[in-house]
């Protein structure tokens, strides 16, 4: 499947000004609202938006608040956020991103995790062999899901693989991941458990004692979050600070014609700004398994 999507990069990476906009056939679109969740009629292949390529550290995410929801680097107290390297890991273990047209509703408490949603699109870990790029739209299939409890919020992590990956035909459920990629599920659990410790935070907790639930459970989570997004985009749920402006969702009162949007800055494709060498430091966490 050739991608219809391209990226427009504004500002230099690793700066507060950096934004990655998504365009479809040259028209700016929202990666949150305009890219369809499902890539085929059978709803077995899904679109994901890559925010953070594997082995990188910059914590980039779809901006919920900004017009057209560009991808930007997250900040804390005005400083750009980077995840630390917890031995033996380097940056993120997977191509990390989000499912479009999904939302973890902060007004809703999940009956099994007993925690509310985290007010973000659904997080996705793509485990294929190719390193993606920020703003890439991949076609993936769902394999399983973990439920991280992050500061008393449910933060689902859906495990997927690019349908074009050589291993994709062999991976159809979570037990196939363990069979063909032994250790990856355990390492994924460990990574999410410890990654905030170098920043002085406690280790994260999981629902289901850290178990990775199977594909059927994961697809139910995806559907629930898609339904929550439907309520958001149609105004049945108050958006809070979320920008719901879009150019394609016919039944949304926030839809605008592309020519009504303010012009975006031109594509710049600037070299990355220098980052502090401490980002490369390895942190050794007691209780982490090598």
Swiss-Prot record:
GO terms for molecular function: inorganic diphosphate phosphatase activity; magnesium ion binding. Its cofactor is Mg(2+). Mg(2+) 1 binds at residues 118, 123, 155. It catalyses: diphosphate + H2O = 2 phosphate + H(+). The keyword Metal-binding applies. It holds the Pfam family Pyrophosphatase. One of its GO terms (biological process) is phosphate-containing compound metabolic process. GO terms for cellular component: cytoplasm. CDD domains: pyrophosphatase. The keyword Ribonucleoprotein does not apply. Keywords: Cytoplasm, Hydrolase, Magnesium, Metal-binding. Its EC number is 3.6.1.1. It is found in: Cytoplasm. Its main location: cytoplasm. Gene3D superfamilies: Inorganic pyrophosphatase. Diphosphate binds at residue 81. Mg(2+) 2 binds at residue 123. Belongs to the PPase family. This is Inorganic pyrophosphatase. It comes from Neurospora crassa (strain ATCC 24698 / 74-OR23-1A / CBS 708.71 / DSM 1257 / FGSC 987).
């Amino acid at each position: 499947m050739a991608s219809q999507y391209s990226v427009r990069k504004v500002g230099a990476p690793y700066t507060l000004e950096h934004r990655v906009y998504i365009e479809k056939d040259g028209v700016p679109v929202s990666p949150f609202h305009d890219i369809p969740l499902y890539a085929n009629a059978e709803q077995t292949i899904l679109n994901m938006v890559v925010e953070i390529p594997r082995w990188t550290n910059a914590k980039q995410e779809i901006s919920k608040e900004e017009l057209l929801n560009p991808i930007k680097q997250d900040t804390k107290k005005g400083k750009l956020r980077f995840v630390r390297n917890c031995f033996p890991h380097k940056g993120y273990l997977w191509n990390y991103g989000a499912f479009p047209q999904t939302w973890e509703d902060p007004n809703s408490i999940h009956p099994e995790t007993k925690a509310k949603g985290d007010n973000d699109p659904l997080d996705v870990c793509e485990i294929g062999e190719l390193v993606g790029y920020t703003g890439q739209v991949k076609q993936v299939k769902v394999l399983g899901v973990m439920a991280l409890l992050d500061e008393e919020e449910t933060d689902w992590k859906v495990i997927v693989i690019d349908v074009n990956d050589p291993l994709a035909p062999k991976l159809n459920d979570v037990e196939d991941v363990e069979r063909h990629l032994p250790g990856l599920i355990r390492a994924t659990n460990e990574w999410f458990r410890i990654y905030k410790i170098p920043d002085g935070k406690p280790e994260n907790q999981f629902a289901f004692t850290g178990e990775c639930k199977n594909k059927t459970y994961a697809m139910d989570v995806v559907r629930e979050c898609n339904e929550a997004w439907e309520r958001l985009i149609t105004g049945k749920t108050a958006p809070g600070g979320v920008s719901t402006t879009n150019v394609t969702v016919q039944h949304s009162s926030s839809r605008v014609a592309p020519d009504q949007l303010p012009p975006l800055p031109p594509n710049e494709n600037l070299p990355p700004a220098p980052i502090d060498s401490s980002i490369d430091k390895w942190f050794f966490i007691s209780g982490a398994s090598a």
